[in-house]
C-alpha cells in the first residue's frame, strides 16, 4: 500500500517536470518514441544544474532536432546479412581499407547499403550534454564575445554540419585546432580564416575532379574527415564548420546550387567579420576567397 502511494506521489511530479518544457520541445519529445528518454535525460541534466543559458541551449537543440538526420551506409553480404565494420576502429584509413579488403575476401558479394536515421530517434543524452558543455567552454573567446546568444545558438552550438553520420567531435577538434588561439591572437577574422585554410591544405586533399567516393555516403562524419584526410568541397565546408565551431568561431555552410559556367553545385562557408558583417569564404581553392553579402 505504501509503495502504491509513493508511485502515485512521484507520477504527478514526473508529469509536472515534463510540462515545464517549452511547447516546441514538447512537440519534438512527442515524436521521439523510445529515444525520448535520452532527450529528457539531457534536458533534465541542465534543468537540475540551473544554468539558465545552458537550459536555453539544450532547449534550442531539442526544439530544432526533428528536421535533422544522418545519411550513412553499412555492408551487406549476398544473403542480406549485415556485416559489422567500423572504419574508425582502426588507427589509420589505410588500415581500415586493408580490413575492408579482408572482409570482402571472407564474404562473397559484399555490397554497401545506404540508409538514413533521424537525430530524434538515435541521439544520446551524453552526446548532447558534452556538446553543450564544450560549446560553452569556448563561448567567451575573443571571436565570440561580440555575438548575441541567439547567434551562438545558431552558429556555434549546433552538433552537426549537414547530413553527416553523427560522431562525438568537439573534444577532438578542440584539441586538434587549439593552436589557433595563439597563432591568430589579435588577428582579423579574415587573417584567422587564412590560418585555418593554410593548415587544412597541409593535410586534407580536395578530391574534386580527382576521385569520386565509391560508398553511398553523401558526407563524411566529423571523425572520418580527420581519418580519411580527403574529400570534395562539401566535406571541406563541413570540416571548416567543425574546426571553427570547436574554437568558438561563428560559422555555417553555404552553397551555390548551380554555377553559370559548369554543372553541379559548390559548397563553402559563411561567418561574420570583425565588424559583424556577414562574409562568405571558400578554403577549397588555392587561396581563400572572400565575398560580402549583397
Locate the predicted segments by residue:
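Bacterial Sec-dependent N-terminal signal peptides
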Residues: 1-21
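Residue-level marker of intrinsically disordered, low-complexity segments enriched
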Residues: 4-8, 59-60, 111, 277
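Hydrophobic/aromatic-rich core segments of domains that either
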Residues: 21-33, 47-48, 182-199, 213-223, ...
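Secondary-structure boundary elements
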Residues: 38-41, 49-228
Amino acid at each position: 500500500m505504501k509503495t502504491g502511494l509513493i508511485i502515485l506521489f512521484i507520477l504527478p511530479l514526473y508529469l509536472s517536470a515534463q510540462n515545464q518544457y517549452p511547447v516546441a520541445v514538447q512537440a519534438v519529445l512527442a515524436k521521439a518514441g523510445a529515444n525520448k528518454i535520452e532527450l529528457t535525460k539531457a534536458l533534465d541534466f541542465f534543468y537540475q544544474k540551473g544554468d539558465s543559458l545552458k537550459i536555453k541551449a539544450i532547449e534550442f537543440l531539442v526544439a530544432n532536432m526533428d528536421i535533422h538526420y544522418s545519411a550513412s551506409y553499412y555492408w551487406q553480404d549476398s544473403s542480406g546479412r549485415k556485416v559489422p565494420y567500423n572504419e574508425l576502429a582502426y588507427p589509420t584509413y589505410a588500415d581500415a581499407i586493408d580490413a575492408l579488403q579482408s572482409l570482402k575476401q571472407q564474404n562473397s558479394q559484399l555490397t554497401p547499403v545506404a540508409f538514413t536515421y533521424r537525430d530524434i530517434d538515435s541521439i544520446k543524452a551524453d552526446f548532447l550534454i558534452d556538446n553543450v558543455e564544450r560549446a560553452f567552454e569556448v563561448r567567451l573567446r575573443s571571436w565570440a564575445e561580440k555575438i548575441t546568444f541567439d547567434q551562438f545558438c545558431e552558429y556555434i552550438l549546433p552538433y552537426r554540419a549537414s547530413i553527416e553520420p553523427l560522431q562525438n567531435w568537439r573534444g577532438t577538434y578542440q584539441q586538434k585546432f587549439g593552436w589557433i588561439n595563439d597563432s591568430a591572437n589579435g588577428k582579423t577574422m579574415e587573417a584567422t580564416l587564412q590560418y585555418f585554410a593554410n593548415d587544412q591544405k597541409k593535410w586534407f586533399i580536395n578530391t574534386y575532379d580527382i576521385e569520386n567516393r565509391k560508398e553511398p555516403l553523401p558526407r563524411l562524419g566529423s571523425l572520418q574527415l580527420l581519418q580519411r584526410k580527403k574529400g570534395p568541397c562539401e566535406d571541406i565546408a563541413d570540416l571548416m564548420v567543425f574546426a571553427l565551431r570547436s574554437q568558438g568561431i561563428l560559422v555555417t555552410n553555404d552553397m551555390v546550387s548551380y554555377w553559370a559556367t559548369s554543372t553541379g553545385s559548390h559548397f563553402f562557408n559563411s561567418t561574420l567579420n570583425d565588424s559583424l558583417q556577414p562574409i562568405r569564404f571558400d578554403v577549397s581553392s588555392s587561396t581563400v576567397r572572400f565575398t560580402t553579402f549583397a
